[in-house]
């Protein structure tokens, strides 16, 4: 009887919570650049950033501002196919695309793009960059060919050698920092745990693959 009453109580409370949610469908008719959403991120100012296969969108609850690549405009994003989004400690928005990385200064409305090693920014070549800003303010870029750490003073990237783990050849699906500052990386080869200095703690193999955290 106690179990049944508890279950009913929990179910009723859950139903009441659900009733308090309001849902709204947002489409291209509302200003979204494309209907296939790849990633969503909320910044410190409350803006919702939406990455699609056809451009980047910033939403302020009322309207969208679109960011698209323009080969004739240096103040445009590196590509329209968006992979991931994060915000650094200075409030700049970083966006990874299949072509490069983009940094957006929303206060000045300035954009700077970073490409692979051929552009002298030391960014390892990849078309699936994943981004993470740690609690200490480090900007880490995970790619298929390795890991990069952003050097703010030099405005460039340093390649991090990760020994005895499978990140250097893995496809990275997701990454997350825990309360201890450890970084968990989900890959097609399993789960990898790193310390805050990106040293390997442990690898967890997955026979199925495509681990997300």
What function would you assign to each model-found segment?
Residues 1-213:
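Carboxylate-rich, polar loop motifs that coordinate divalent cations or form catalytic acidic clusters
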């Amino acid at each position: 009887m106690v179990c049944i009453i508890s279950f009913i109580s929990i179910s009723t409370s859950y139903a009441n919570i659900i009733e308090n949610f309001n849902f709204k469908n947002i489409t291209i008719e509302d200003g979204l650049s494309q209907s296939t959403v790849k990633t969503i991120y909320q910044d410190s100012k409350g803006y919702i950033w939406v990455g699609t296969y056809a451009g980047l969108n910033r939403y302020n609850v009322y309207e969208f501002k679109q960011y698209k690549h323009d080969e004739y405009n240096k103040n445009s994003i590196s590509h329209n196919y968006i992979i991931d989004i994060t915000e650094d400690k200075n409030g700049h928005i970083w966006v990874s695309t299949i072509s490069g990385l983009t940094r957006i200064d929303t206060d000045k409305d300035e954009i700077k793009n970073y490409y692979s090693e051929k552009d002298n920014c030391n960014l390892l070549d990849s078309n699936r960059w994943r981004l993470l800003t740690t609690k200490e303010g480090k900007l880490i870029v995970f790619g298929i060919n390795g890991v990069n750490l952003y050097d703010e003073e030099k405005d460039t990237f340093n390649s991090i050698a990760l020994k005895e783990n499978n990140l250097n050849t893995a496809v990275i699906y997701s990454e997350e920092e825990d309360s201890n500052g450890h970084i968990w990386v989900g890959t097609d080869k399993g789960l990898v745990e790193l310390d805050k200095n990106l040293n390997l703690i442990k690898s967890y193999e997955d026979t199925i693959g495509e681990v997300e955290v």
